[in-house]
A protein has these predicted regions:
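Active-site Tyr-X1-5-Lys
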Residues: 142-163
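N-terminal Rossmann NAD(P)H-binding glycine-rich loop of SDR-like oxidoreductase domains
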Residues: 4-26
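N-terminal Rossmann-fold cofactor-binding loop
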Residues: 33-39, 54
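Conserved Rossmann-fold NAD(P)-dependent oxidoreductase catalytic core, especially the SDR/UDP-sugar
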Residues: 99-146
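SDR active-site strand-loop-helix element
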Residues: 9, 33, 72-76, 115-121
């Protein structure tokens, strides 16, 4: 059986870095996509860094075409403080970038076994709404900041892509 080829956006971020380590430990060939031009992790047999920006549809398409992943883990996003301070950039990265990624997958007709979109608890509103019961999948969507709204948009695109 062939090793999985996993394309990870946001691969140099906190969660992305951990995901890359876990995937490599499991024997996957990982293609890390991020804005970082000189990542701390060096390219090796199991890891290949692909410099690119989620706001660049052509760069996303080219990277996916060249890597032909079997799996995609989409972790790349502008976080809450940056979405607050730079709302239009947050929209471009978190919404348009996610859309560019889904569109490229469709146009290239990638044979994906799995596409994982990382959402956020920010779509459900502040923790104070839920108390000790926590958040459940059937709870209402109540984003309380732009980051949460942008993640709701990503969830909608993920559902549409899946169908």
């Amino acid at each position: 059986m062939n090793r999985p080829r996993v394309f990870v956006t946001g691969s140099t971020g906190c969660i992305g870095n951990h995901a890359v380590n876990l995937l490599m430990a499991e024997g996957a060939e990982v293609y890390g996509f991020s804005r970082t031009t000189s990542p701390e992790r060096q390219t090796c047999d199991d890891y290949h860094h692909v410099s690119g920006d989620l706001t660049d549809a052509d760069a996303i398409r080219k990277a996916l075409d060249e890597t032909q992943p079997t799996h995609i883990i989409h972790l790349g996003a502008l976080q809450t403080p940056d979405c607050r301070d730079y709302p239009m950039l947050g929209l471009e990265v978190n919404v348009l970038g996610t859309g560019f990624l889904f569109r490229a997958c469709q146009e290239l007709k990638l044979s994906l076994e799995r596409f994982v979109f990382a959402s956020s608890s920010a779509v459900n509103g502040p923790r104070s709404l839920y108390g000790s019961k926590g958040v459940h999948t059937d709870d209402p969507i109540q984003p309380f900041n732009l980051y949460g709204y942008w993640k709701v948009a990503g969830e909608g695109m993920a559902r549409a892509f899946h169908q």
